[in-house]
Amino acid sequence: MRRAFTVCAAVAIIVCAAMLASCSADDTEAGCSTDDTKERYSAYYKKCQEYTTLYGSPEVASDGSGPGAAQYGKGLCVVKLLDMDADGKDELILMHSEGPSNALVGAVEVFSYRKGEVVCDYSGSIHSDSTNGWLPFVVLDKLQSGGWALMNQTCFGSAPVTFTYTLVGYNSDGTFGPIAGRASGPSADFSFSDSSTWGVRLYTFSEGDGSAWTPADWQEVSQEEYDAAFDSVVTGETTVNLLYQFKSDGGREGAISLVDTVDEARATISKLAEAA
């Protein structure tokens, strides 16, 4: 009886050891709840170091002097931690810029940490236009799963400009690509105005089979009202997906939703460095 108990105990120890080894090897396996935040952030920091060596540190540059000069983000100017697949662990979003032109803005890249390595799950052309001068930004949409998707905008024509949208993110099978059932919305036309007024046009996604964007009517607002609406989007106090700004300075238009700034990039790199 004693020998049988000893054998059972030994088997139990071996099984437990195997389960622990499995969790250590891949913390995404079912039943494993290993907290690898320190290792994850340390690995992400090394990736940021690699990119700052290639493209430079986050900075705000200018193409001239005086009130007419355009400012733009340069170097690794978008660095964001976000749990895109709603698994409780952050992915890393990176984008770099080499100058005041869309042609010089690099791809948006999404990295995850799996089996002790940083893996690039996506590298592609997202809505990498700019706002507030030439600070690159990414547009993010909250999914019903609790995760997030990046919005890809494609522009056609001029006066009016036609935009089409595609959401890309993690699907239920773990692949990164167009979101099933919510991949796109109809095109929308925008005409640029020479008016000096400010305005907003708010968008939300319809529930269900996700085939429709629901635009609100155009609203002219004061700059103070615009700033308040902008703040509510940035801080997540509203469920609005996009906020469009129309101004008279060259008719520039930009989507402003959860804007990633140079300051945020610097702060995120510092946060990752603390774990390294």
Predicted regions and their residues:
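Beta-propeller blade repeat segments, especially FG-GAP/WD-type strand-to-loop junctions
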Residues: 105-122, 166-172
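Short, solvent-exposed loop/turn segments at conserved positions within beta-propeller repeat blades
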Residues: 101-106, 159-162
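Positively charged n-region of N-terminal signal peptides that target proteins for export
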Residues: 1-9
